[in-house]
Amino acid sequence: MHHDLLIVASEVLFSPFMDGILKDWTPSRPHGSSAGLSLSGGIDSTACMAIMPDDTVLLHHRRSFKSLLKHDGADSLFKHIERTTGRTVHSIPSDHENIRVHWGKSVGFSTDMAAAVHLILLADHFDLRGIAIGMPLDNTYLWHGFRYRDFSTTVWWQRWGSLFKSIGLDIILPIAGVSEATAVRIVQDAGLGHVVSSCLRAKHPGCGRCWKCFHKNGMLGHPYNINSREIQTFLSKRPVRTATHALWWVNEQNHWDQVPDLSHMSELDFSWWTKHHPPAFDLLPDWIRPVIQSAIETATEPIPVDSPFHTWNLFPDAD
């Protein structure tokens, strides 16, 4: 394993708690030849798999410690993938989500890119030149899901993009220019809508009570209880969590009675939500861009230049 991979793995896991990890370090790892995908088994990463080359290496992060989160849904999808395509999903056990606990925080990823640390550490083994993650437009060109921004100029992209590129690993964001709604459509078009689930609480089709069952699995026709505690809690927050997608779904299902103070938003033009943002293609490395761009352009139309998306701000008073 190249030393650079250990350095960057340490950065994604420990940088929120330790300074100077990259000090006096000069990267030197050459790029490999293959693309790798952090495949959680949820809708967003499955959509990435559907539009990436068939030889993309599929790697899953599996919690190796006792947890409320379940891998049953993901395992069902992985078995289906292997049975129908012959492709292998490499499930890598790890307890790195416990690192945060030592600094008084809850279990979880130390940074966004910690979700791909298994790909970093196995980059030489699989000869990787790029790492893909399922980050939709909701998290890229929309700040906290409700306010437009130019993602290419963000600190996130400039920090992680340049760091990974320096060790021969391009960050690949296949669905950066499409919403969660379009990700669902891509999964359905790939014939995987009946086996995929973003719920981590129960087996397929999900628990029906969590936020993911509401705004993700619900689009696949899976049942959800709008009155469940978690769904009601998130609907009552301002700004609403994953606001644009959640309110688009509220509009689609006519759930405005659940958010009466936001009922005026039913007059907004959400039509762009199922289209794609062409500038996101510029984030893709040249060596993989044609395949992904072609798939997205086939699946959906571009967002018009006069769309309200370009000035979108659902909660202008929010910090």
Question: Can you annotate each of these PLM segments?
Answer:
Residues 4, 9, 17-35, 43, ...:
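Nucleotide-activated chemistry modules centered on ATP-dependent adenylation/adenylyltransferase
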Residues 40:
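Metallo-beta-lactamase
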